[in-house]
Each structure stands twice: as structure tokens, then as C-alpha cells.
């Protein structure tokens, strides 16, 4: 059906009234069909003042509307009743999000990237002048850094830096002598043990 704008408006009004009867007045399916029949019965050339709002439809158009309501609202009437009357649990689904806020463009933090400018311009016009406390803090940090560097350099010095060549030679000779004496003593003990073993064997052979 090709309805006019006014007919579409009246049709939507009729549909809204049917849903209102269902949701608010709790009309049953039989009552809704009866109410629709009473409204549509007044459509025609001899319409009464009661259905003045719907006299824009002809009988053929009214029959088309009834056929549409049969296969839509009335066919699924129980579903609409369940939709309007049944209580349902409300499931609230939420997510927690952590939003990191950009730190303020205050010393020593730089401005956000989209607001970035050249270092020369920042140093000349924007960078705040250091306060005495800040200067003292910077000096303390520099002094601490220098002391740490000196300590690390002292630790990395050559461990033999305080000895002369003669001292190193004498130390090596002393260590070598101690090692050689220990080896000679060990060899002498082993030879003595072997000599005693040979002498014992010779004595056994003589007695035999």
C-alpha cells in the first residue's frame, strides 16, 4: 500500500494505541482484537464522529492494516506480554580503566610532545631561572658525581703501582724458592720410602 504522509501518521497512532492498551491497560489478545474491530468498523463512507481520526483510510486500506497487525502484533502477542510484564535482572557490565595524566610542564619535566618546541627557544624564553636551593642541589649532585668518579678511578689503579721492579723480582724469587724447597722435600721423602722398600725385598731374597 502506498500511504500518504497523513495516513502513515494515523497508522503509527493506531499502533501506538494498541501497544498502550497492552502495556498500560493490560488488555488481553481478545480485548485488543475487539477494540481494533470497533475502530475499523467505523471506517467507510458512513463513518461516525467517534472514529474521526481514522476516516482517512478506505476499506481496502483498513483491511491491509488488519492483515499486517495479524502477522505482526497479534501473532506475537504473548511475546509482547512477556516483554512488558516480566521482570528481568539488570546486568551491569563495567570495566576499570587506568588513565595516566600527563605531568604538568614544570621543571624538570618537559612539555607534552604535541606542545614541544626547540631546546634553544625553551632555554631562552620558558625555562625558569634556577633558585638558590636548586643551584645548591645541582652543585651537590655534581660534587657527588665527581667524588664517585675519583673513587672508581682509585679502585681501578694498578695493584702493582706502588712496587719497584726489584721488589717484584725479590717476591718472585722468594715464592720460587719456597715452591722448590717444598718439591725437593716431597721428592726426598718418596725416594726414601722406595729405598726402604727395596732394602726389605733384598733382605727377603737373602734369607730365601
From Swiss-Prot:
Tissue: Testis-specific. Expressed in spermatocytes and round spermatids (at protein level).
Keywords assigned: Calcium, Cell projection, Cilium, Cytoplasm, Cytoskeleton, Flagellum, Metal-binding
An individual GO BP term: sperm flagellum assembly
A molecular function (GO) term: calcium ion binding
Highest taxon of the lineage: Eukaryota
Location in the cell: Cytoplasm; Cytoplasm, Cytoskeleton, Microtubule organizing center, Centrosome; Cell projection, Cilium, Flagellum
InterPro entries: CLAMP
Coiled-coil positions: none
Any one GO CC term of the record: cytoplasm
Pfam (any one): CLAMP
Predominant localisation class: cytoplasm
Known function: Calcium-binding protein. May be involved in the control of sperm flagellar movement.
Record protein name field: Ciliary-associated calcium-binding coiled-coil protein 1
Species in which this protein is naturally found: Mus musculus
Gene responsible for this protein: Cabcoco1
Amino acid at each position: 500500500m502506498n500511504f500518504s504522509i497523513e495516513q502513515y501518521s494515523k497508522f503509527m497512532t493506531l499502533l501506538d494505541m494498541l501497544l498502550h492498551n497492552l502495556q498500560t491497560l493490560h488488555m488481553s489478545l481478545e480485548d485488543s482484537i475487539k477494540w481494533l474491530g470497533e475502530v475499523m468498523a467505523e471506517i467507510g463512507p458512513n463513518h461516525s464522529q467517534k472514529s474521526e481520526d481514522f476516516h482517512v483510510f478506505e476499506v481496502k486500506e483498513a483491511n491491509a492494516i488488519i492483515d499486517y497487525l495479524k502477522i505482526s502484533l497479534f501473532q506475537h502477542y504473548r511475546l509482547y506480554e512477556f516483554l512488558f510484564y516480566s521482570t528481568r535482572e539488570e546486568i551491569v557490565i563495567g570495566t576499570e580503566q587506568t588513565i595516566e595524566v600527563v605531568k604538568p610542564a614544570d621543571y624538570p619535566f618537559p612539555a607534552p610532545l604535541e606542545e614541544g618546541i626547540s631546546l634553544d627557544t625553551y632555554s631562552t624564553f620558558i625555562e625558569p631561572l634556577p633558585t638558590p636551593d636548586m643551584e645548591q642541589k645541582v652543585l651537590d649532585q655534581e660534587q657527588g658525581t665527581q667524588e664517585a668518579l675519583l673513587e672508581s678511578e682509585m679502585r681501578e689503579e694498578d695493584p702493582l703501582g706502588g712496587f719497584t721492579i726489584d721488589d717484584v723480582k725479590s717476591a718472585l724469587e722468594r715464592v720460587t724458592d719456597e715452591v722448590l724447597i717444598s718439591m725437593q722435600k716431597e721428592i726426598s721423602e718418596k725416594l726414601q720410602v722406595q729405598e726402604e722398600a727395596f732394602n726389605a725385598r733384598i733382605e727377603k731374597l737373602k734369607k730365601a
